[in-house]
A protein has these predicted regions:
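Conserved hydrophobic beta-strand within the GNAT/NAT acetyltransferase core sheet
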Residues: 89, 123-127
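Conserved acetyl-CoA-binding loop-helix of GNAT-fold acetyltransferases
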Residues: 94, 100-113, 136
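Conserved active-site alpha-helix within GNAT-family acetyltransferase domains
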Residues: 1, 105, 117, 128-154
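A short beta-loop-alpha structural element at the N-terminal edge
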Residues: 27-38
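Catalytic cores of nucleotide-enabled group-transfer and carboxylate-activating enzymes in metabolic
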Residues: 36, 69-74, 81-82, 92, ...
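Acyl-donor-binding surface of acyltransferase catalytic domains
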Residues: 1-22, 127, 139, 148-150
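Short gly/pro-enriched beta-turn/loop segments at secondary-structure junctions
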Residues: 21-24, 34, 61-64
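A conserved beta-strand-loop-helix scaffold within acyl/acetyltransferase catalytic domains
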Residues: 41-96
């Protein structure tokens, strides 16, 4: 899975982020420091303990570099950035029961605007799975010879 490069100076409008899912009853916002436990539990339940650990560092940053999607006071998605490495987006995920509603794209856009607001010109999507989704959504391009990149020699 290659890394992708995203030019943050050509992002879709901010309105395609949180505002795009609000009318669907989804609140998309930054996580709060006191929400680390429920966010971590959501990630462990729906994705992996490794992702929960990788995302934990976002709660030590100011502002927190983790957006969450909430519906009926339940977390249904998350997107971390500045977690794996500087300027990296991810990990990210949406509860399988809530996919196909634009939530993942909204989380992506909000997070990339978050990187932009931190002063980066480019963002990196590490070990991107759905390359075509990222290309269509934010103009991401494959970084040649980027696998395994920062994911080489991981402890398991």
């Amino acid at each position: 899975m290659p890394d992708l490069l995203v030019p943050l100076y050509r992002l879709p409008p901010r309105e395609t982020g949180a505002a795009s899912v609000r009318d669907k009853g989804v609140i998309l916002r930054r996580a709060n420091p006191f929400e680390q436990t429920p966010v971590g539990a959501f990630i462990r339940t729906h994705f992996s303990a490794g992702w929960a650990e990788e995302t934990a560092v976002t709660f030590a940053r100011q502002p927190i570099t983790n957006f969450i999607a909430i519906e009926d006071k339940k977390i249904i998605g998350f997107a971390a950035f500045e977690s794996t490495r500087k300027a990296f987006f991810g990990p990210t995920g949406v509860d399988p029961a809530h996919r196909g509603r634009g939530i993942g794209r909204a989380l992506l856009v909000e997070s990339l605007w978050g990187l932009h607001d931190l002063g980066y010109a480019y963002g990196i999507i590490g070990a991107a799975g759905p390359v075509e989704f990222y290309r269509k959504s934010v103009g991401a391009i494959v970084i040649p010879d980027s696998w395994p990149g920062v994911y080489a020699d991981l402890l398991r």
